[in-house]
């Protein structure tokens, strides 16, 4: 197989296997997203422009072709504006890498940088009212191991405003609950790490959880804090498991609380924590990185207008 532009594919290989992994230290999810973007771009060249993979090279990364690729994602693959923008960001990142390796390719950055991003509609901020949150927390059966586990997970998620993936990734060694200043160590998007303080109530709850679910004689720092047991084998709890039990508890909670949303999902706990702090008077300038996405949605500019809040809690 003869390639028209061998340097193009070598650059893709090094970009995906070395630059994103070693230099940028991106998470596996981000690496996967960038790889998918380039795969889709090559698919577009083949299906829409009739170019075999061997015929594609740097000279084909033009303003016209990239604009056509984004239009194809919209009309043929029905991608949302935010997804289309993510694909464009990945291609721009590749163009930047290519220009670092060979400055003569800086023109790629200029061409692709001129491609307009898609306008995205503002997302509705979904959160649970205080009453709905209380009703949700009442649903797990604390006399059962899984029920107690689910309760502890939801309480910890609300207390720390952690993302679901961040909590399922937590290992016992990431907890520090015996000292004067108890904390939890979270690894977020892009492998960004942060230390989050824990409230006294959560520390007491976690100590009970550890005694019940991780007895001291067999406890190891490398063990995942939250796990499932199937046929006697422990496995890291998945985000799908969290989504399922929260959906179940949300449906049960709606029977006793009319303010419960029709659909309850993990990220609502993160938004709920941020909204409850915001309503209690926390200035946006004090929001740390844990709430950066929420703070962007509640920018000083947007507060001048009604904020889209999806909750039935009375004003």
Protein language model regions, located:
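Conserved catalytic core of the tyrosine transesterase superfamily
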Residues: 1-315
């Amino acid at each position: 197989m003869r390639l028209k532009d061998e340097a193009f594919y070598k650059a893709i290989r090094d970009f995906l296997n070395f630059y994103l992994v070693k230099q940028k230290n991106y998470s596996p999810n981000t690496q996967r997203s960038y790889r998918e973007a380039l795969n889709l771009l090559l698919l577009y060249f083949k299906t829409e422009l009739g170019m075999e993979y061997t015929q594609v090279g740097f000279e084909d990364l033009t303003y016209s072709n990239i604009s056509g690729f984004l239009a194809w994602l919209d009309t043929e693959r029905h991608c949302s504006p935010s997804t289309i923008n993510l694909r464009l960001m990945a291609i721009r990142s590749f163009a930047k890498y290519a220009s670092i390796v060979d400055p003569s390719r800086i023109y790629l950055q200029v061409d692709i940088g001129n491609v307009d991003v898609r306008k995205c509609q503002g997302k509705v901020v979904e959160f649970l009212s205080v009453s709905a949150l209380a009703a949700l927390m009442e649903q797990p059966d604390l006399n059962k191991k899984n029920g107690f586990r689910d309760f502890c997970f939801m309480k910890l998620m609300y207390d720390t405003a952690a993302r679901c993936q961040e909590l399922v990734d937590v290992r016992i060694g990431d907890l520090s609950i015996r000292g004067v200043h108890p904390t939890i160590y979270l690894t977020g998007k892009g492998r960004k790490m942060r230390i989050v303080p824990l409230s006294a109530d959560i520390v007491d709850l976690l100590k009970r959880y550890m005694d019940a679910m991780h007895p001291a004689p067999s406890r190891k720092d490398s063990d995942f804090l939250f796990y499932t047991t199937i046929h006697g084998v422990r496995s890291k709890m998945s985000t799908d498991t969290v989504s399922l039990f929260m959906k179940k508890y949300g449906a049960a909670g709606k029977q006793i609380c009319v303010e419960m949303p029709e659909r309850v999902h993990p990220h609502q706990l993160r938004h709920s924590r941020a909204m409850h702090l915001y309503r209690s008077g926390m200035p946006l300038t004090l929001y740390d990185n844990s709430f950066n996405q929420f703070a962007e949605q509640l920018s000083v500019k947007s507060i001048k207008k009604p904020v889209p809040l999806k909750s039935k809690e009375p004003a």
